[in-house]
């Protein structure tokens, strides 16, 4: 044994080779160290988890759970973190390990989302394959400051005669649509989106806490009318967790801000913020936050104000700064149409009063009008637009001055006329005119009207062309007049649709058109 070892010199290594080999091994040794901010779930109840041992967590941070899910840190307490699970939570158990990600929730943004239906996290749910979005954006962003804003002076045409004439909406405005259930709130918002299909305005429709069947119907209607290709639909249906319903409006807003910040115009509909407030109330109560009025938490005003302040018209300097000089000389806007559902017409409840005070006006839809067949059921008495007047199309503004007054006077006189049988001629004329205008403001769903169509209709009403027409024939007269005008005065129609201008020459042409029609046509 001893001899054989001594005799085998090939086995021997000198000391320098050994030290070189050790150095090589040390140099090539790769240590992968990962610092993880880890904690343990100590309780799970109703989608709320309490986590112990998770240090350095931000408010609103994403916390990674087993199974690739996430929770959102909302309560940062001395010895635990209260988080709300985004998604199913039935299989979560006490003792499970969770990890802080160090990231705030972000959603994909960009033109790749147009024409798609996504959930709150921006994941497609329409079965049309993955979305190859190049950018993401945080869901919570501070709204542009006063210096970055520009006054609202460009119109958003909803296609509704009653809205565009009496309660005009401008790009960058927040206009609340408020009313009881089944008064046509969603119908009005969807028609406004359909009317943008050729206006260059992108649309985002955020459905919060609605039935999946209702949302599917909305998507189908948008597709049928060719508006889906310019629209992003964000869905947090009634079956989703409260966390996703609470976050959906912010996610949709981030998608809309992508267009605003790049000098484009976008319109966002929140349908509806009452359900978002209820979801937030549920989360807050489960997190043991102290309840206030109607059991809502103290910060429910801030919940909506920080969302709606992000709808704005931003100036060209802001857009240029944001795009690093790529887009010059263009202002951007995000117009918001939040929807609030009232209970038995009570606009003085907590959430409705909050949102009324945040927004730049409201369109109030009344059950009585809706049931009487006045659709859209806009109440001109308490509906206002605080900033839209300066954004109204010139021709509509010039022609529609007397519409609101006529309707308000008619409502007042109609109530008075019930008690009196012998009315003087002037009162009868006013009542007759008010009835005709009310009839004329009726409009079918999914039939938004162009600027020319609205202008001609209002012109006919204001210049007394309806005075000798039976009430039941008013809408037939309107349809025949518009059909005649599109055929015989196509150039005038195209000019008004394009420019919205109004002068003596255009007025003379409108008068000639209406006179010719009444003299030669039947309806």
From Swiss-Prot:
Alphabetized UniProt keyword annotations: ATP synthesis, ATP-binding, Cell inner membrane, Cell membrane, CF(1), Hydrogen ion transport, Ion transport, Membrane, Nucleotide-binding, Translocase, Transport
Tree of life domain: Bacteria
InterPro entries linked to this entry: ATP_synth_asu-like_sf, ATP_synth_asu_C, ATP_synth_asu_C_sf, ATP_synth_F1_a_nt-bd_dom, ATP_synth_F1_asu, ATPase_a/bsu_AS, ATPase_F1/V1/A1_a/bsu_N, ATPase_F1/V1/A1_a/bsu_N_sf
GO CC list: plasma membrane; proton-transporting ATP synthase complex
Subcellular location(s) of the protein: Cell inner membrane
EC number, as in UniProt: 7.1.2.2
Membrane topology: Peripheral membrane protein
Disulfide bond annotation, renumbered to this chain: none
Residues the entry annotates as binding ATP: 179-186
One GO MF term attached to the UniProt entry: proton-transporting ATP synthase activity, rotational mechanism
Catalytic activity from the UniProt record: ATP + H2O + 4 H(+)(in) = ADP + phosphate + 5 H(+)(out)
Enzyme class: translocase
Pfam families according to UniProt: ATP-synt_ab, ATP-synt_ab_C, ATP-synt_ab_N
Segments crossing the lipid bilayer: none
Assigned protein family: Belongs to the ATPase alpha/beta chains family.
Self-association and partners: F-type ATPases have 2 components, CF(1) - the catalytic core - and CF(0) - the membrane proton channel. CF(1) has five subunits: alpha(3), beta(3), gamma(1), delta(1), epsilon(1). CF(0) has three main subunits: a(1), b(2) and c(9-12). The alpha and beta chains form an alternating ring which encloses part of the gamma chain. CF(1) is attached to CF(0) by a central stalk formed by the gamma and epsilon chains, while a peripheral stalk is formed by the delta and b chains.
Biological role stated in the UniProt entry: Produces ATP from ADP in the presence of a proton gradient across the membrane. The alpha chain is a regulatory subunit.
Protein name (Swiss-Prot/TrEMBL): ATP synthase subunit alpha
């Amino acid at each position: 044994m001893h001899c054989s070892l001594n005799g085998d010199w090939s086995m021997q290594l000198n000391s320098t080779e050994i030290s070189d080999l050790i150095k090589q091994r040390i140099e090539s040794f790769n240590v992968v160290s990962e610092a993880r901010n880890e904690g343990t779930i100590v309780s799970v109840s109703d989608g709320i988890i309490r986590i112990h041992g998770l240090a350095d967590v931000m408010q609103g941070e994403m916390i990674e759970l087993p199974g690739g899910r996430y929770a959102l840190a909302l309560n940062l307490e001395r010895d635990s973190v209260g988080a709300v699970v985004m998604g199913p939570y039935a299989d979560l158990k006490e003792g499970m390990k969770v990890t802080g990600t160090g990231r705030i929730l972000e959603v994909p943004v960009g033109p790749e989302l147009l024409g798609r239906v996504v959930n709150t996290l921006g994941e497609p749910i329409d079965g049309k394959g993955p979305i190859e979005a190049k950018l993401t954006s945080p869901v919570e962003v501070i709204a542009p400051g006063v210096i970055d804003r520009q006054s609202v002076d460009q119109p958003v045409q909803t296609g509704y005669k009653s809205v565009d004439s009496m309660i005009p909406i401008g790009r960058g405005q927040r206009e609340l649509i408020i009313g009881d259930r089944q008064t046509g709130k969603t119908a009005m918002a969807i028609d406004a989106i359909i009317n943008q299909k050729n206006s260059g305005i992108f649309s985002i429709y955020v459905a919060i806490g609605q039935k999946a069947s209702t949302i599917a119907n909305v998507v189908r209607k948008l597709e049928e009318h060719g508006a889906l290709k310019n629209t992003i639909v964000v869905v947090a249906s009634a079956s989703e967790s409260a966390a996703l319903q609470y976050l959906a409006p912010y996610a949709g807003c981030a998608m809309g801000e992508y267009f605003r910040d790049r000098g484009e115009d976008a319109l966002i509909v929140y349908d509806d913020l009452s359900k978002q407030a209820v979801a937030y109330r549920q989360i807050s109560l489960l997190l043991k936050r102290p309840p206030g009025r109607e059991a809502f938490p103290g910060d429910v005003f801030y919940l909506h104000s920080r969302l709606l302040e992000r709808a704005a018209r931003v100036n060209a300097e802001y857009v240029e700064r944001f795009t690093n000089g790529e887009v010059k000389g263009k202002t951007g806007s995000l117009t918001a149409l939040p929807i609030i559902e009232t209970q038995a017409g009570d606009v003085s409840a907590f959430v409705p009063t909050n949102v009324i005070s945040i927004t730049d006006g409201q369109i109030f839809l009344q059950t009585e009008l809706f049931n009487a067949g006045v659709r859209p059921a806009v109440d001109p008495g308490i509906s206002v637009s605080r900033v839209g007047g300066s954004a109204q199309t010139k021709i509509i503004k010039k022609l529609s001055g007397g519409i609101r007054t006529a309707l308000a006077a008619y409502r007042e006189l109609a109530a008075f006329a019930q008690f009196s049988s012998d009315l003087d001629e002037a009162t009868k004329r006013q009542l007759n005119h008010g009835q005709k205008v009310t009839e004329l403001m009726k409009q079918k769903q999914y039939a938004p009207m162009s600027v020319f169509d609205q202008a001609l209709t209002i012109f006919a009403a204001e210049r007394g062309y309806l005075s000798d027409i039976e009430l039941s024939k008013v809408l037939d007269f309107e349809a025949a007049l518009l059909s005649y005008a599109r055929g015989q005065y196509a150039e005038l129609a195209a000019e008004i649709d394009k420019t919205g201008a109004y002068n003596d020459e255009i007025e003379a042409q409108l008068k000639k058109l209406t006179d010719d029609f009444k003299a030669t046509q039947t309806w």
